[in-house]
Structure formats: C-alpha cells, structure tokens
C-alpha cells in the first residue's frame, strides 16, 4: 500500500504479526520491538529485519539463526535510562557493544531506550542528550557509525517541536498513530483522527431489575461490580442490559460508552451489565432493544487487546 511507503519499518511485539506483514508485503522492513526469547531466535530472524536487544545470550542465538539462514540481521541495543524496563546498564555499554561486535551476521545499527511505558518516566531533553552522548561515545571508541538512535515511543513526539537533539532520529510509534493523541499530555495531533476505532457489543438480555442483589453475598464471586451498586436505594428499579463481552475480552475500564446516560454495573468473564435507567426516549418509546448494539470508544490498551483476540470480529470501513 502506498500510504505505508514513507516509514522506516513496521514494528510488532508479536511474531505472528510480523509474519502476517511479511506475507502481505515482503518488501516492508519489519522490527521485533521487544527483547527476543531465545527459543524464538530462528523465527525472529525469519520475519524481522531488525530487533531490539539487552541480552548477549539472546543476540548470540540471533547470530546463530542468522548464519543458518544466510542473513545479515540488524539490531538496536537498548540502554536503561530510568524507566526500569528493558535496557542494559549504562556502565556496561562499551563491553556489551564490543562483545556483540564480534558476532557473525549481526549488524549493530543503533542505540535506543524505553521511557514512559511502565513507570511513566518522561523522555526529557536531558534523557535524549544522554542517549545522544552514548552514540557519540560508541562511534568514537569503535569508529563505527550508528544510523538509528531510537528515542522512545509516542510519548516522545510532543518534544520534537521543542528543544530536541537532532541525532535522535527513530521513534517506535503506536498509540499516537492509532488514537490520534499524545499519551504524554492527551492532546490531539492536528492531522490525526481520534475516532479511528469503535467497539460495539450486542444486548443479549434487557430487563427491569432491582438495583441491589438479593441474598447473602459471598467472597466466591468472580465478577467485578461498580461501587455505586452497594449504595443504591433498596427499592429502586431500573433497566439492566447484559452485553456479550466480559473481562476475558477487554477491561471495561478501558471502554467509554458513547451514550453518556448508561452506567457500568458489573462484569464477569464473558458478560457485562450496564444500567439504562428508564430505557425511554423523549417520546416514550424504548431506547434500547434486545439485539441492539451499544457502542464504545476504546482506549489504546482496549484496542490492543481486542485486535489481538481471534474471538472479536473486526470490520474495516
């Protein structure tokens, strides 16, 4: 597709995703964007042109697989800059690079870091300068050019228009492209849509029921309910709709109903209940019926889970 020709590569943390990309567009460069499990080294080399690494043992496995497949595999070494997710310790970089440099069929093309994904450490100018300095250190010490300095994910994008090191030239972008906003400040990007995804669930039961359950409540329940359920009037009733999704499919907290008048009541493994109030339109007609869809705006995490589920139907419009 022409619209994806001006990017460096397509990254995925799922090898099944990279395999599908190569089947559709063998010419597209692909990147495996998490450290490689050793047992999957052969598959990584087969379907990824690039991969990110923090383990010398894993890179040796990648090297052996690349030799066997007669391929030159490109890698980015990830450095720990405070997020405490993937990344080698900074003081070990020179020795690590030197060891990897000796491996056959491995080309070190860059350095990278992960920020903002677990603890939420911001990719500040100071952090990016540190990453740039490690590039300079490696290039001076080994007389080898590093083409890619991967400065993080979507959270880094708002900083580009501010003071930003020019040497940081690669970003692993997902959330901003798909959701149209920055995870750093929640602001919308001018040229991107914030409505690219919608999730809809079907009403499989619709009944007027009491607001609180009747009977002895034990600790054996496996569901999750709204705190407001326990504060409701003992005698009040309202219409409850059971929708055909549960916690196995997606976390309800990652879904925002497009109809602001409905409220979450509870969820179990495969069904979720919402309160519809009187379920009346201004003209007195029922607002919702059995079989009707209830529509939601999903968060990035909801989209990721739903798109990776083989049980969820996907429609591209």
Please tell me what each predicted stretch does.
Residues 1-133, 141-142:
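Active-site-proximal beta-alpha core segment in soluble small-molecule metabolic enzymes
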